[in-house]
A protein has these predicted regions:
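Predominantly flavin-linked oxidoreductase catalytic cores and closely associated redox partners
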Residues: 52, 134, 138-139, 143-213
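Helix-loop-beta segment of a Rossmann-like dinucleotide-binding subdomain
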Residues: 112-133, 142, 170
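Extended hydrophobic secondary-structure segments that form protein cores and membrane-embedded regions
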Residues: 27, 55-63, 196-201
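N-terminal FAD cofactor-binding segment of flavoenzymes
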Residues: 53-110
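Rossmann-like flavin
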Residues: 65, 93, 97-110, 127-130, ...
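Glycine-rich Rossmann-fold phosphate-binding loop(s) that bind the pyrophosphate
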Residues: 32-33, 133
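N-terminal Rossmann-fold NAD(P) dinucleotide-binding loop
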Residues: 36
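Extreme N-terminal leader/targeting segments of oxidoreductases
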Residues: 1-28, 42-57, 178
């Protein structure tokens, strides 16, 4: 298997020339943030609607889902309403409804409140919710697992795998047990090849694999 695959450059590159275990999935999602988890959830929903069974794997570099998510956010619940109808009855994380907005124009010595009619729509939050995005992401992870999605936290993706024809075939997770020079120690554990018919990169805007593609 490894002989027919190439590797794209990435961060914390795995040691070359060693045999690695491999797992096959229909879809491999890199990144267990809101986008990656929503993708996994929707794919499983669509498969169920067609009476199909697909395997979906999500890998996350953080020690747990939500560990690398900014702590706070104001969210528009419309996406949750579409993705998970009835989500409010499914034990979501604590949320506070946004009831008022204040936009202030600040000078060196004064502040001026911008009237509601002059506030840009993107800055109006009536009907939205204030929530810990880390908690929301962990909750989404639970919803995904309930649908049969396999989530592997603590497994950073280190490289992209390509076929001989240059198609993305999956990713290699980072090796563990390396010294400061990147050489294997006695505790060395090679990363795994996670192979998918489709690979979704949901690392965020600073994802190193996305920059390498």
């Amino acid at each position: 298997m490894t002989g027919s695959l190439g590797m794209g450059m990435g961060q914390d590159e795995p040691v070359d020339g060693i045999e690695r275990d491999a797992m096959e999935f229909d879809v491999v999602v890199v990144g267990a943030g809101p986008a990656g988890l929503a993708t996994a959830i929707r794919l499983k929903q669509l498969a169920a609607e067609r009476s199909q069974d697909i395997s979906v794997c999500v890998i996350e570099k953080g020690a747990e889902v939500g560990a690398h998510i900014l702590s706070g956010a104001v969210i528009d619940p419309g996406a949750l309403d579409e993705l998970l109808p009835g989500w409010k009855e499914n034990d979501p994380p604590a949320m506070t409804a946004a009831t008022t907005d204040e936009v202030l124009f600040l000078s060196a010595a004064h502040q001026l409140k911008v009237p509601a009619w002059a506030t840009p729509p993107a800055m109006q939050n009536h009907g939205n919710y204030i929530v810990s995005l880390a908690q929301l992401t962990r909750w989404l992870g639970g919803q995904a697992e309930a649908l049969g999605v396999e989530i592997y936290p603590g497994f950073p993706a280190a490289r992209v795998l390509y076929t001989a024809e240059g198609q993305v075939r999956g990713v290699v997770t980072g090796d563990m047990g390396l010294d400061r020079d990147g050489q294997p120690t006695d505790a060395f554990q090679p990363g795994m090849e996670l192979l998918g018919r489709y690979t979704v990169f949901a690392e965020g805007s600073r994802g190193h694999l996305g920059r390498a593609l």
